Amino acid sequence: MEFFLDPSTWAGLLTLVILEVVLGIDNLIFVAILSEKLPPNQRDKARLIGLGLALVMRLALLSLISWIVTLNSPIVHNKFFSLSIRDIILLFGGFFLLFKTTMELHERLENNHHENSENKNYAGFWAVVIQIVVLDAVFSLDAIITAVGMVNQLLIMMIAVILATFLMLLASKALTNFINLHQTVVVLCLSFLLMIGFSLVTEALRFCIPKGYLYAAIGFSILIEIFNQIARHNFMKNQSRRPMRQRAAEAILRLMVGEQNKKQQIKKIEINSQKTDSIQSSKEMETFKDEERYMINGVLTLAGRSIRSIMTPRSNISWVNTEKNTDEIRMQLLDTPHSLFPVCKGELDEIIGIVRAKELLVAIEKKIDASTFSSKILPIIIPDTLDPIKLLGVLRRAQGSFVIVSNEFGVVQGLITPLDVLEAIAGEFPDADETPDIIQENNSWLVKGETDLHSLQQLLNTEELIKEDNYASLGGLLIAQKGQLPIPGEIIHIHPFYFHIVKATEYRIDLVRIIKNQDDN
């Protein structure tokens, strides 16, 4: 045992342990990939048995060192090639590794491994263990021959093999979990195994490929994959800072837009193909209609909208002024296609109450004072900063009535009905006395200045309009873009659209024509 006092013995032991770990990594990678085919509760067991058998096999082969040394003696020899027992084992192991790795790569590239865990068909436990043992035999032989070439003492070899296997056991679970969680790493590892299998075949046939080249290629690939994982980690970290609703909406809309972009290909399939199954598959691909995409987007983006973008603005509110005579009030109620009215004294900010048109008409016929009658139902007033999701609860409590939106100074900004919320989700439903906010013409859109930006953005299929929450209408956007109220005839460019001001007063923008620049499309 005095050789343990020799520093060169410890240096050789350390070097051999490192080499054994390096030579065992490919074995460890294959064990990790094979163990994924087993049920989760059997994977650790298979991994431990696989590495345990590798240790037993290597210790057994170490005890047969004198026989292993003779494995390099040719047993098949002719003028074209010569093969030893070692070469035959390496050749068999190389082809087996190439076959298994190719099958695994094919499965990954065809995406056949993504199945429901409840319905997934797992491989048999011992079938996986046998495959691990076969590869262990090949990798063990390579590791033992390396050990024999480096160290003369059998005890040192056994200690190095035991330590290397113990280190691999410690790292095996973490490596397995990492590989299984990162599918790009799995493909990278399978590519490494392809290279290793090819090198085993060429080595068996005496075509020498310097191991340094292989290690350099593997090291460079690992470096690139590290950069890839860092980039992905930073991307996920930046994405996590964004609102969850916004990320979910974008993901779902990307899916729907992807389906929408297939329509042209679907039509070609229907025209060119005479087969019933092709036509049937093309119909199944048309999953989402434009209206469905609009509504889903409206639901997903509702929470991120402001109350101002949902409400009917102050300028469009039809209200009853109690300072008018009864004949004027009666004519207003009969001519306006609304069933509910806010009743005010002189101006909209002086709200007395909310009445139904037919009930107020009956009260007027009975000579009942409009102010007295209207004060029975007081208005529900909400701030213009209220969250749209909380607004739904307020509308439920209103029991079919509307709610008044007011700013911090008590000035009425607009009103919201359940129909306004529905329009925010499904699009515009014009009243009998209204014209549509958006009229689509040949290659342009004629849009009212008060049109909600969210609805317009969905219709134009763009994300370039809403950059801030300071404005909710098209007019507000164009005024903010120009820095002042634009005049009729002016053109404002917001990529990829041109906004032609058709009609504007000194206070607001009334009508805009939108034209998309086809060169920017």
Curated annotation (Swiss-Prot):
Q: Which residues form the CBS domain?
A: 311-370, 374-434
| Annotated keywords | CBS domain, Cell membrane, Membrane, Repeat, Transmembrane, Transmembrane helix
Membrane-topology annotation of the record: Multi-pass membrane protein
Transmembrane segment boundaries: 13-33, 49-69, 80-100, 125-145, 150-170, 185-205, 207-227
Give this protein's Gene Ontology molecular function annotations: flavin adenine dinucleotide binding
Q: Which SUPFAM superfamilies match?
A: CBS-domain pair, FAD-binding/transporter-associated domain-like
- Which Pfam families does UniProt cross-reference here? CorC_HlyC (PF03471), TerC (PF03741)
- What InterPro entries is this protein classified in? CBS_dom (IPR000644), CBS_dom_sf (IPR046342), FAD-bd_PCMH-like_sf (IPR036318), FAD-bd_PCMH_sub2 (IPR016169), Integral_membrane_TerC (IPR005496), Ion_transp-like_CBS (IPR044751), Transptr-assoc_dom (IPR005170)
Q: Which PROSITE patterns match?
A: CBS
Annotated compartments? Cell membrane
Task: Output a single Gene Ontology CC term carried by this record.
Answer: plasma membrane
Gene3D superfamilies in the record: 3.30.465.10, CBS-domain
UniProt lists the family membership as follows: Belongs to the UPF0053 family.
Official protein name in the record:
UPF0053 protein BU323
